[in-house]
Amino acid sequence: MASIQNLYETVSRVLGNQAGKVISALGEITVECLPEHYISVMTALRDHEELHFELLVDLCGVDYSTYKNEAWQGKRFAVVSQLLSVKNNQRIRVRVWVSDDDFPVVESVVDIYNSADWYEREAFDLYGIMFNNHPDLRRILTDYGFVGHPFRKDFPISGYVEMRYDEEQKRVIYQPVTIEPREITPRIVREENYGGQ
């Protein structure tokens, strides 16, 4: 097993200018790239004989709009992939920043890693990130009629619609949310009455 420093140097050399940044922190390597280099970076990480990251073990969307409880200055959305090289016993993270915050789109990597199929559908469903050339990009966790993308940080906690069974229509129907926010008043316990004394 090669060291993290060796992996850092190899990845930097192999990817060259395609990688916007190669970061070594906390014993992990993260490659940050632009959307236009995403496919070539993922292909190089899989196919290069010194790297051989043959497995995509996770892919997710991230909404950085309020990262670390403060306003974020960069791009709002990113797609983060975790790759594994069984041959070299190494892991690497790839982060691609989505260029348009209003209509987030990146290329699909299903043709490179077929395990990305449902992960990309999940990122689309929960964050609204579109994946160009995905073979079946549709919702996977929420209803087909669901409004919005629930993991976006600007999505309301109570949602927009709720579903219930309508006895008259004998079916499940959607209606606007009827939940009223509650005011929670903390209960004060006085020492003299504490414990039933």
Curated annotation (Swiss-Prot):
Broad class of the protein's primary localization: membrane
EC number: 7.1.1.-
Xref: InterPro entries: NADH_DH_suC, NADH_quin_OxRdtase_su_C/D-like, NADH_UbQ_OxRdtase_30kDa_su, NADH_UbQ_OxRdtase_CS
Superkingdom, natural source: Bacteria
The protein's name: NADH-quinone oxidoreductase subunit C
Assigned keywords, A-Z: Cell inner membrane, Cell membrane, Membrane, NAD, Quinone, Translocase, Transport, Ubiquinone
Protein's UniProt keywords contain Translocase: yes
HAMAP family attached to this UniProt entry: NDH1_NuoC
Gene Ontology, cellular component aspect: plasma membrane
Membrane-topology annotation of the record: Peripheral membrane protein
SUPFAM superfamilies membership: Nqo5-like
Reaction catalysed by this enzyme: a quinone + NADH + 5 H(+)(in) = a quinol + NAD(+) + 4 H(+)(out)
Biological role: NDH-1 shuttles electrons from NADH, via FMN and iron-sulfur (Fe-S) centers, to quinones in the respiratory chain. The immediate electron acceptor for the enzyme in this species is believed to be ubiquinone. Couples the redox reaction to proton translocation (for every two electrons transferred, four hydrogen ions are translocated across the cytoplasmic membrane), and thus conserves the redox energy in a proton gradient.
